[in-house]
Amino acid sequence: DWSSDVCSSDLGAATAMVMGGPGAIFWMWVSAIFGMATIFVEASLAQKYKTVDENGEVTGGPAYYIRAAYKGPFGKVLAVIFAILISLALGLFGNMVQSNSISAAFNSAFGIDPMIVGVIVAVLAGFIFLGGIGRIASVTEKLVPIMAVFYILGALILIIMNIGNFPEALRQIFVGAFNPGAALGGFTGVAVSSAIQYGVARGLFSNEAGMGSTPHAHAVAKVDHPCDQGLVAICSVFIDTLIVLNLTAFSVLCTGQLHEYNQSLTAAELTQAAFESAYGHFGAIFIAICMFFFAFSTIIGWYFFGEKNVRYLFKHHPAVAAKVYAAIVVVFIVVGSMLKVDLVWNLSDLFNSLMVIPNVLGLWALSNVAKDLYDDWKKQPAKVK
């Protein structure tokens, strides 16, 4: 998913550096490397335990493989806990981060009141949630990959223009991972634990490996073997964290925008400052437009992940529950646009972390199943393309 990859990487990298210094990027790399193995298992198990819902649509995700992992009351309760947490973490608190970022970017570029932006985003999202997908979703789907390509090209040109600062940017990342104050003067008061904390937390937000969110998308893919989708999932994390994330990080560091420790600075504003240094005010406008499409697409995707779990929780009245959930999400989108950025991120971090617990318990219990799937996959004849 181009939108989720680019948006989460942009927001994740920028906020990690604001809160934990340049060294947080190093810990995002570390989390991505471990995350590749985790997400391979998640996607493979999501494929193995997928099912068909009441509408005849293929569905799956952690709630389903957790039930398969633990028979009896414990498995049922654990699956319900996960479904509740993801419904809150993504649809509500995660989407608050997205609307907050869109609002901050538009306020910085055009001076528009954040609440007005939040209301517009909420109305557009509400139409899609309640069935009016049509043109809005279609236009977004077509424009997001184009915007992603422009964003990547813009970041590459920006880094090349400031290539002389690249060695210093690398130094700041590696030194800052273990001594934030030595990497950049403004981060003297930042402890190594903060670099690790925000690097891992934003890495989780960025690639979602271990959270249990992406298995919902991987479950519906049509593949010959469950592990084929596991490989796709690994590639997604690689592109997300080791390519897109680095473009954002080096854009900020090579242009020297992270010169002072300011936790009130938003991710969007930091990225806008980097692009403005090379492209003038057009850079801020460009990032605002990119942020809208990337974050808006992520809002839609995360809502549907949450909705799948709401339907799981309310099996007897899924349609009614989904509509109520949609209305609540719309309200949270508006509220998120107006709240302080650190509060929004803290809520998102908390629930993202809580999601990991039941999901990892399910993965751990099914580790032998995952190994059997992998062993069987290795025996498959190589496909001739």
Go through the PLM ranges and name each one.
Residues 34-42, 119-133, 144-164, 197, ...:
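Selective recognition of specific alpha-helical transmembrane segments in multi-pass small-molecule
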